[in-house]
Amino acid sequence: MDTVERTDLVARFTEEVIERDEIETLFEEQDEPTAYIGYAPTGEMHIGHFTTMRKLADFIDAGLDVTVLVADLHAHLDDAKSPFELLEARSEYYERAIEGMIAAAGADPDGISFIRGTDFQLDEPYTLDLYRLLADTTLSRAQRAGSEVVRQSENPSLGSLVYTLMQALDVAALDADIAYGGIDQRGIYMLAREQLPDHGYDKPACVFAPLLSGLSGGKMSASEAGSKINLTDDGEAIDEKIGGAYCPAGETEENGVLEYLEYLVFPVFDQRDTSFVVERPEKYGGDLEYGTYDELEADFVSGELHPADLKPAAAAAIDEVVAPVRELLLEDPELLASAYPERYE
């Protein structure tokens, strides 16, 4: 692949890229630029994480050196979402789940490297750099940067503010040319682009994934079980959630069913050279087969494809994609119980 093709692969199925020309320059100057994504091991991973993880398959194919940070300290700093005693089990669970998602997306999990926050964030050089960032950042700037990521209140904990600066610093500490994350991470990585050059580091290029709508419409909520599909949900649960999902005929706005198809199912099926089939009785026009998401959306908007026909096909396809990850996680019930005792014990 040439530089343009590699950049196209990095940029596809994303919400925003800052800046495309910077990524092209990286490919022109380096054989294997570096990229990283960080996840704080808090709640169970779900299909929203899967769409973000699937993108790493594109990064690997484009020839990026990819690191996944399991940010264990961050998981406690953000309003103690993960108690200290659960950090080890949840970190192991996240690594296992991410490996499963990468494999299910058609890439080799050996193409990514894992690192935990405690592997480097307690070292003296990192700590000194963090103190320098703390000295240079106002309270309001830190709050603004992390407003979409950490819990906010009128009287925030210091942990939530340190969290934001640590995430910005992680880019430099991991020597990442590209910072990747959901679009909710934008504020933090703009802070990194703004401040890291003042401390002797290069500013990172940034790639942002879209945040999916919940199945009930609006933003996906980690606390609302029916708004998302967990990686351990079985086929029956997936069918039930998709069957009850917000998916009004002809409407694409805040339609989680369509978004799951666009950002997860079709990219995975494309990797497998598989088409998406909607089964319909002959009296309603017979089966429909789609090679691209755009074709499906056009039929949905025009009314050719009805939600009653789309939903069963979507549920079956999502189950097919999630199944190998589900099987991998359920093979180790002790890990699930250790990481999330309130659900699996």
Swiss-Prot record:
<keyword id="KW-0963">Cytoplasm</keyword>
<keyword id="KW-0547">Nucleotide-binding</keyword>
<keyword id="KW-0030">Aminoacyl-tRNA synthetase</keyword>
<protein>
    <recommendedName>
        <fullName>Tyrosine--tRNA ligase</fullName>
        <ecNumber>6.1.1.1</ecNumber>
    </recommendedName>
</protein>
<feature type="binding site">
    <location>
        <position position="167"/>
    </location>
    <ligand>
        <name>L-tyrosine</name>
    </ligand>
</feature>
<comment type="function">
    <text>Catalyzes the attachment of tyrosine to tRNA(Tyr) in a two-step reaction: tyrosine is first activated by ATP to form Tyr-AMP and then transferred to the acceptor end of tRNA(Tyr).</text>
</comment>
<dbReference type="InterPro" id="IPR002307">
    <property type="entry name" value="Tyr-tRNA-ligase"/>
</dbReference>
<dbReference type="GO" id="GO:0005737">
    <property type="term" value="C:cytoplasm"/>
</dbReference>
<dbReference type="InterPro" id="IPR023617">
    <property type="entry name" value="Tyr-tRNA-ligase_arc/euk-type"/>
</dbReference>
<feature type="binding site">
    <location>
        <position position="185"/>
    </location>
    <ligand>
        <name>L-tyrosine</name>
    </ligand>
</feature>
<feature type="binding site">
    <location>
        <position position="163"/>
    </location>
    <ligand>
        <name>L-tyrosine</name>
    </ligand>
</feature>
<keyword id="KW-0648">Protein biosynthesis</keyword>
<comment type="subunit">
    <text>Homodimer.</text>
</comment>
<dbReference type="InterPro" id="IPR023684">
    <property type="entry name" value="Tyr-tRNA-ligase_3"/>
</dbReference>
<keyword id="KW-0436">Ligase</keyword>
<comment type="similarity">
    <text>Belongs to the class-I aminoacyl-tRNA synthetase family. TyrS type 3 subfamily.</text>
</comment>
<dbReference type="GO" id="GO:0005524">
    <property type="term" value="F:ATP binding"/>
</dbReference>
<keyword id="KW-0067">ATP-binding</keyword>
<feature type="short sequence motif" description="'HIGH' region">
    <location>
        <begin position="41"/>
        <end position="49"/>
    </location>
</feature>
<dbReference type="InterPro" id="IPR050489">
    <property type="entry name" value="Tyr-tRNA_synthase"/>
</dbReference>
<dbReference type="InterPro" id="IPR001412">
    <property type="entry name" value="aa-tRNA-synth_I_CS"/>
</dbReference>
<dbReference type="Pfam" id="PF00579">
    <property type="entry name" value="tRNA-synt_1b"/>
</dbReference>
<dbReference type="GO" id="GO:0006437">
    <property type="term" value="P:tyrosyl-tRNA aminoacylation"/>
</dbReference>
<dbReference type="InterPro" id="IPR002305">
    <property type="entry name" value="aa-tRNA-synth_Ic"/>
</dbReference>
<dbReference type="GO" id="GO:0004831">
    <property type="term" value="F:tyrosine-tRNA ligase activity"/>
</dbReference>
<dbReference type="InterPro" id="IPR014729">
    <property type="entry name" value="Rossmann-like_a/b/a_fold"/>
</dbReference>
<feature type="binding site">
    <location>
        <position position="170"/>
    </location>
    <ligand>
        <name>L-tyrosine</name>
    </ligand>
</feature>
<feature type="binding site">
    <location>
        <position position="36"/>
    </location>
    <ligand>
        <name>L-tyrosine</name>
    </ligand>
</feature>
